[in-house]
Regions:
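C-terminal motif of bacterial Sec signal peptides marking the signal peptidase cleavage site
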Residues: 17-19
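Low-complexity, acidic Ser/Thr/Pro/Gly-rich terminal tails and inter-domain linkers that flank the onset
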Residues: 27-67, 209-210
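The feature marks short-to-medium sequence segments in extracytoplasmic or secretory-pathway proteins
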Residues: 80-132, 137
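Short, hydrophobic/aromatic beta-strand segments
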Residues: 83-91, 152-154, 240-244
Length: 321
């Protein structure tokens, strides 16, 4: 009987403790994410955008939103036109979470007051739809989580105009395979003793393509593999957004954590969007960039491997893949 009483007392204490859980988000200005915001101005509308990291989201919302696969995207819009504009949150993510949906997904058991505060806080900090003439508004769109990089489209509409801004954010905290190259001039890294040839005509480009290897190889070049069937001509700031916009994800660097996670998904199924992929070789090195697009299962995914070629076309970089 005495043990039973102890159990009841402990249970009541636990319920009391959980019921006293307070909602204590860090003030937004103290989190520091706005320092990373990027800005664009077009047709009288200025947009500032930043994608919060897992740590910033936890501080700003007192909850591990990334664990719930929710990623807050902060947006500030300044309307310097003479007409009211309308912001469309689904331009950021067609499947974005409504503020009260986020509060419901992150609610705490036996913490009614804290949950009410969450609902109010998430709603008050969401991005307004209306952008009055001559004013600035800001807030969050609660998007689905993306790691490594995110393409953000911000669209606003008025009676006489439609304005859109495109941003590409590399999100800190994710180690992608291409991070192994470091910073600096990639041509000097990949071709330190080779002159980069600039192709001036389509004929020169066609001839160069015909001279390229037909397939990838293994590390020592003794076996061939997948065909090389793609040539991309474009600046990185144009190519990278195009792939993110089309649903391609960066690939995690090969490491113990990513390998274990891949194994778990391989056994139990499900889609691991960032699974590391094997190395294939062109120009004597493994892929410079690896991207992938997964289906509903890790066993069904498309891989894209790209190598920076030792040529340019009228000064524009060339990638082969």
């Amino acid at each position: 009987m005495r043990d039973a009483r102890k159990f009841v007392v402990l249970g009541m204490a636990l319920v009391s403790f959980l019921g006293c859980r307070t909602f204590s988000p860090t003030p937004m200005d103290e989190v520091g994410f706005k320092e990373r915001a990027e800005s664009q101005t077009e047709d009288g509308i200025t947009a500032r955008v930043v994608v919060l990291t897992a740590e910033e989201a936890k501080a700003a919302f007192d909850c591990k939103l990334y664990k719930k696969k929710i990623q807050p995207v902060w947006i500030e819009l300044t309307n310097e036109t003479d007409e009211e504009m309308l912001f469309i949150p689904r331009s950021v993510d067609p499947d974005y979470f409504a503020p009260l949906e986020v509060a419901q997904k992150t609610s705490w058991t036996w913490s009614k007051q804290a949950n009410l505060e969450k609902k109010r806080y998430y709603y008050e900090n969401s991005m307004p739809f209306l952008l009055p003439a001559g004013e600035t508004v800001s807030g969050f769109v609660y998007a689905n989580r993306s790691l490594g990089g995110r393409w953000v489209l911000v669209e606003v509409f008025g009676r006489t105009r439609k304005v859109h801004h495109e941003f590409v954010h590399e999100i800190p905290g994710f180690k992608a395979d291409f991070h192994r190259h470091g910073e600096g001039d990639v041509y000097s890294q990949f071709y330190p003793d080779q002159e980069i040839v600039d192709l001036a005509t389509e004929e020169e480009l066609r001839k160069w393509i015909e001279e390229q290897p037909a397939t990838v190889t293994n590390a020592d070049g003794t076996k061939t593999g997948d065909p090389l069937n793609l040539v991309i001509i474009g600046e990185p700031e144009a190519v990278w957004p195009a792939f993110l916009r089309s649903g391609w994800d960066p690939t995690a660097a090969m490491g113990a954590g990513s390998v274990v996670k891949t194994g778990i998904f391989g056994i139990f199924g499900g889609a691991y969007r960032y699974a590391p992929i094997s190395n294939l070789y062109v120009y004597g090195r493994s892929q410079d960039i690896a991207l992938q697009k997964v289906r509903s299962n890790i066993h069904y995914r498309n891989h894209l491997r790209l190598w920076l070629a030792p040529v340019t076309v009228k000064g524009i970089p060339v990638l082969i893949g």
